[in-house]
Design a protein with these regions (language model features):
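N-terminal export leaders
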Residues: 1-3
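Extended soluble regions of mature proteins
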Residues: 18-215
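Cleavable N-terminal signal peptides
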Residues: 6-7, 17
Length: 215
């Protein structure tokens, strides 16, 4: 039931100054393919003071994640159950080791210099090639580092392309077959309440399911 987020080490890395300055919401459309065919959902990011809240729609009220790099914690909020789960984020050194083991050197990153306007922001198309397949990421440095809420909660390593490029956020991702699994549709700079980045007092803590070992 838990929709996950990997790249935990990315959350602990020091963001760039201009990324820290962003406060507001980022709305995106994310898609995936499964046994039942293509699926799509709207995901909302809220960013304030280094903290992040990711909200995903779904039956029974969906779920939200709060990431607090200073606490090295991730909180999964389950609104329908008035409950939450807590996860400790790995340290950056351990994440770098996992990234290297995952084969970061096998990924080739090519900046094309081609730019596009997406959701009112300028991004540069970057080709990420691995094992004969290339993915086009249109990246901006204005929103900080990306966290993928659709990935599984396995204490995942930093994605190889992020290891090479640093704190950049994809506004649009295009696969080799032309499909677009991620596209930002709206970016709004605005003040956000601290309460959005805290677990509600009425929520009860429940146990996080054990992670499956990679592979």
């Amino acid at each position: 039931m838990v929709a996950g987020v990997t790249m935990a080490g990315a959350l602990l890395a020091a963001p760039r100054l201009h990324a820290q300055a962003f406060e507001g919401s980022i709305t995106m459309r994310m898609g995936s393919r499964g046994p039942q065919g293509a699926m799509s959902q709207v995901v909302e990011y809220l960013v304030r003071g280094g903290k992040m809240r990711v909200t995903m729609g779904g039956p029974m009220g969906g779920a939200a994640m709060i990431v607090s790099p200073t606490e090295k914690k991730l909180y999964m909020l389950l609104a329908a159950q008035n409950s939450y789960m807590e996860m400790s984020l790995p340290d950056s050194a351990a994440d770098r080791a996992r990234t290297a083991a995952a084969g970061a050197d096998s990924v080739t990153v090519t900046r094309t210099g081609r730019r596009e306007q997406v959701a009112g922001l300028t991004c540069e198309h970057v080709l990420v090639s691995s094992r004969g397949s290339a993915t086009d990421l249109c990246l901006t440095p204005e929103l900080g580092r990306f966290v993928n809420p659709m990935a599984s909660l396995q204490g995942g390593a930093l994605a190889p392309w992020q290891r090479q490029l640093g704190a950049e956020f994809p506004l649009k991702v295009t696969m080799a077959d032309g499909s677009v699994p991620l596209e930002v549709t709206k970016v709004e700079r605005k003040r956000l309440s601290n309460d959005l980045f805290a677990v509600p007092n009425s929520y009860t803590k429940v146990t996080m399911p054990p992670r499956r070992s990679p592979g």
